[in-house]
Amino acid sequence: MDLLANVPSWSDIERSLDQKFSAVNQSIHQGLQSANDSWHGFSRRVSDGAGQAYGYLGGHRIDNVQQALAMSYPIFQEDLKRKWASIGIEQILPVLLQLVKEVSMILGGSIAVGSAAGGAIGALAFGVGAAPGAVAGAGIGLEVGNLILLALGLSAIAEYFIKGLPVCLATLQEGIATAWNAEEGVKPAGLDPTGGSVAVIQERTERAARQLARGQEQLVLLLLMAIVTYLLRGQMKAGIMGSMENIATRSAKLQADIANKQFGAWLAKNEAKLLAHPDLQIKGPTPVKKPEPLQPARQPEKASAPKPVAKPAVMSLREAVGNQTADRWISTGRRIADFTDPKRSALLTDDQIGALHGYTTNEGYQWINPALRGQTPLSPQMEAFVTHANEGLAKLPSYTLGDTFRGTTLPEDVMSRMQVGLPTSDAAFLSTSADRALAFNGNVKMTLQGVTGKDISFLSGHREAEVLFGPGTRFNVVDRVDNGSVTQFILKEIP
């Protein structure tokens, strides 16, 4: 893939953002004429503010982002090879790696310039939010999505691909934001003889790398799902097309349009495997299959006793989140739990303790809770993670030492539904603290009278006295007090 023939590196941006983003515009004029007008306008908005960028930023932020990106690519490749070996993904790894590098470069460069122009990460007018961690919007998703599809020759799948792209870009932006702010709140490395600052910066950069790898993997999954959906349904404007003849016609058209020959050859070879892969199946109306030939009538057989149906095996934590992440969560969680409470540690399998410890990390709960709330897609890997965490919670004794507390920020529409006498619940895991002083701040403070909460502080490594409730736990609103900017609730669990 050659999305941008002369796409600049982070070193180029560090030396001169203005000069190098102008080079991006020039490179587009040398090729990809069909994408010229769109990209020229897109990159012009990036380069408009680039003249002041380097002087405002300095080099350390870009260095940290560059390091996180470099660390993310091996994680991304390993996860792809493990999860998608059945469809020969290794054959197009160079194409996919180039794709995610260029998308990260576009998004990261946009954020860099936006930070200089707006004083906060991503302060640009074309869709990326003005605050760290804000979600990349439809504007940048549309423009970047069109560039990707034009370069690959996959414009036919645009409706399905672009619709899901902002979620992928949001995950990538989250990783870039984590690396960008890696040095916030710590002493400069040269002024900290203990080495603690260096360790904190490195931990944040590694976390950013894992977030970036996850966003890159989401991008590839979206591309594959868009291809499968197009082959099965056709373009949205044409309606749902179900016959095998139409699938064959669409397949031939798609392969004829593909600009990257390596990608086209891979698709031709693995199309049947793609269409049959369970993780790429689409929801909604399914294609109409050819009628099967009639079979000779069989004589009725004597009814036999039904055989018990084996429960399908849940994928391991390593299969769900990758070997590196799973091993780190399992080893860290087990080490902390064995030291803090060996008896409770012995109750949990490695997958269960790894999932619960992983949830207590920023990367864990920020990954799973939005999906449980329906804000991001819930993949089979996420479902496996939830299963291991729930099974681990079920083995632990309930917390019985009193009320727990939670501070959070809720939008007005959610708060308006939390009225005295009505039930309420969160589709995600619900984190609370046994210590009122350790509960997080926000516009809402809750006192929870729980029954099924489990103390997981013995495996977390954080001093938050965390008591965790499973997804969907239901509470009654016993009391509500609106006190200026803070609303206080008393919630009692419904047995």
From Swiss-Prot:
- Using the UniProt annotation, give all residue ranges assigned to the region (ART domain): 344-495
Active-site annotation: 406, 431, 466
Q: Which GO terms describe its cellular component?
A: extracellular region; host cell cytoplasm
Q: Where is the TR mART core domain?
A: 315-495
**GO molecular-function annotation terms?**
NAD+-protein-arginine ADP-ribosyltransferase activity; nucleotidyltransferase activity; toxin activity
- Region (Disordered): which ranges? 278-309
**Pfam families assigned:** ART, DUF6861
Q: Which reaction does it catalyse?
A: L-arginyl-[protein] + NAD(+) = N(omega)-(ADP-D-ribosyl)-L-arginyl-[protein] + nicotinamide + H(+)
Keywords, alphabetical: Glycosyltransferase, Host cytoplasm, Nucleotidyltransferase, Secreted, Toxin, Transferase, Virulence
Look up the domain of life of the source: Bacteria
Where found?
Secreted; Host cytoplasm
Per the UniProt entry, the Enzyme Commission number(s) are 2.4.2.31
UniProt entry tagged with the keyword Secreted: yes
Give the comment on domains: The ART domain is toxic when expressed as a protein fragment.
Q: What does this protein do?
A: Toxic component of a contact-dependent interbacterial competition system (also called effector-immunity systems). Acts by ADP-ribosylating a number of target proteins in target cells; E.coli target proteins include FtsZ, EFTu, RNase E, Fis, YegQ, GuaB and IF2.
Q: Which family does it belong to?
A: Belongs to the Arg-specific ADP-ribosyltransferase family.
Return the protein name: NAD(+)--protein-arginine ADP-ribosyltransferase Tre1
